[in-house]
Amino acid sequence: MQKHNIPFHEKHKGQLFCDRSAEDLIQMLLAECNGSANGGNVTRWQPCSLKDIRYSDAAPEAQRYEVDTGQGTVHAAAVVVATGGLSIPKIGATDIGYRLAKQFNLRVVEPRPGLVPLTFDDKAWAPYAQLSGLSLPVRIETGTKKTLQSFDEDLLFTHRGLSGPGVLQISSYWQVGTDLRINLAPEVDLAEALMAAKQHSKKLIANELNAWVPSRLADTWVSQDTAWQRPVIEASDKALNLLAQRLSAWPLTPTGTEGYKKA
């Protein structure tokens, strides 16, 4: 990027974006392919269909791969497959990479959507569907011990489940049938904060929670238990500790994902 004087910026935790347009990236890659200063010498065929790939041990090393294309047959010492995966089929994604791997007896991890929103049972999700559009920073994790994965990122509520950077990241590690644990207020010890507030605050618990989580989320949470629908000073220690536990380690078991169309 710097070599080609393309201005860019960090938008969010390592996510880099061009200041002008992604077209700058395309032109950079084309320049590198065309042999710009310190660049390569690449012949580019576009469009060009792939018909078949064959391999022969008997052929000279530089010609062991024979590739039949829409623009003729090519011989090479190696073939690089950079086809991408199954994500977003509407733009033409196919399973050709997996088929080629199978053809040459390469081990393939069973493919499944990654970096994808997670969905939940409609009935179980009903209390939270009203939060659609709400975003907040969280700590989200899945797995245990050696398989534990955790991310501190933003979460987004949707009508069908959860999305946002944190959920997209954790989706690559979540296994069907296992749970997620979400800390909705990762910057504070909620149990300690609520106990401290109990000593002097006459605010409703929901209003007290507004200091740490969005008001819509606080209202939704306290509506689940009458013990939380009162001034914090009148709440029992047990009720406050349970509330803090639910908000700090919210257990959820997704039923699935939005699939390859959103991956």
Residue ranges and their predicted role:
Residues 2-12:
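Glycine-rich active-site loop/strand segments that organize a redox cofactor
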Residues 12-31, 45, 88-92, 119, ...:
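Short beta-strand to alpha-helix junction loop
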Residues 33-50, 111:
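A conserved beta-strand/loop element that lines the FAD pocket in flavoprotein oxidoreductases
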Residues 19, 23, 114-123, 250, ...:
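Flavin (FAD/FMN) cofactor-binding core of flavoprotein oxidoreductases
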Residues 50, 74-93, 100-102, 154-160:
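Short hydrophobic core segments
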Residues 106-110, 116-238:
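An anion/pyrophosphate-binding glycine-rich loop and adjacent beta-alpha core
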Residues 46-63, 116:
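A conserved short coil-to-beta-strand element within the FAD-binding core of flavoproteins
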Residues 45-47, 223-263:
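A glycine-rich dinucleotide-binding beta-alpha-beta segment and adjacent secondary-structure elements
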